[in-house]
């Protein structure tokens, strides 16, 4: 495999061939760079109804084949983060390169290989089961790595408005940690950010009695916030955390007491808490310290959880049959578009390649994992939509 050329590998793998075509496209957020066109053409040939949902500079693709339940949806993104310093890459990040059994390119792991595997898995399943029960859907966006305000959330809003709900959704995020197939994400913590401004009175630093230092005033409250146990978590989630990300105050000189301090912070919270409850608790602590303050809140995602059930179990079986591993269910990590999809889908999980190189220089995916990933997705379709006596 180490001496295999990319051309030879592409001939041997339909999934790799499509992944390479996607990876050649410089689809840095929010530019889709034609990735949706490639995928839509393949899906249209399979009988999918295609919808384009463009909002501002963001391209979104919704595709569905069938009208019955259950609905199994593959969800993902075609945008990638910027490559960073090109001179520090061993090869052009938008010219896929095979080296030592690994495919190198920006988006190889996060998550164009998953996008390609979605398509080829569906093609193979439909070749065997054209009259399968239920429906298959795709939800793709070019705005997952950016603000995520015009991407998946907009398509979800449109589907919800017309009463179109999903039963199962597999998001192709790179979830594998140490080896391919070791982790399925069956939930994510919520993310609640706040910008706190504590007001004081500006003055000369030599005359503190004529001023009120907002940093000093806020310090005891900050200490209490940092020490507060917000909840104990639960069997799926660790306890909620509160962390300061930035503190800004002062004029840049050493002889002026600032008139205000701005503190930016973030909660990563579990299903054991609510955003409203956390906001109320913060206000209560700040009020108890007698501060003159204001807060701007931003809830970028609620927590979601898919307990063990049909989707977790069937996908775990598929992973085990392909890799021999029994994946761990995990809710660790940051947010994903699963937080939006959970609003219209009763079971949402994430599964994809190794995540060790994502957003890094020389991002890559192991060549052997490319077809393994497609096989897992195909088996998942079979288990969720196929007959029990006919397995992949």
From Swiss-Prot:
InterPro entries: Bact_exopeptidase_dim_dom, DapE_proteobac, Peptidase_M20, Peptidase_M20_dimer, Peptidase_M20A
Cofactor annotation remark: Binds 2 Zn(2+) or Co(2+) ions per subunit.
Cross-referenced Gene3D superfamilies: Zn peptidases
GO BP of this protein: diaminopimelate biosynthetic process; L-arginine biosynthetic process; lysine biosynthetic process via diaminopimelate
Active site positions, chain numbering: 79, 144 (proton acceptor)
Catalytic activity: N-succinyl-(2S,6S)-2,6-diaminopimelate + H2O = (2S,6S)-2,6-diaminopimelate + succinate
SUPFAM superfamilies: Bacterial exopeptidase dimerisation domain (SSF55031), Zn-dependent exopeptidases (SSF53187)
Domain of life assignment: Bacteria
One Pfam family in the UniProt entry: Peptidase_M20
GO molecular function, a single term: cobalt ion binding
Positions annotated to bind Zn(2+) 2: 110, 145, 359
Record key words, sorted: Amino-acid biosynthesis, Cobalt, Diaminopimelate biosynthesis, Hydrolase, Lysine biosynthesis, Metal-binding, Zinc
Residues annotated to bind Zn(2+) 1: 77, 110, 173
HAMAP family assigned: DapE (MF_01690)
Protein name: Succinyl-diaminopimelate desuccinylase
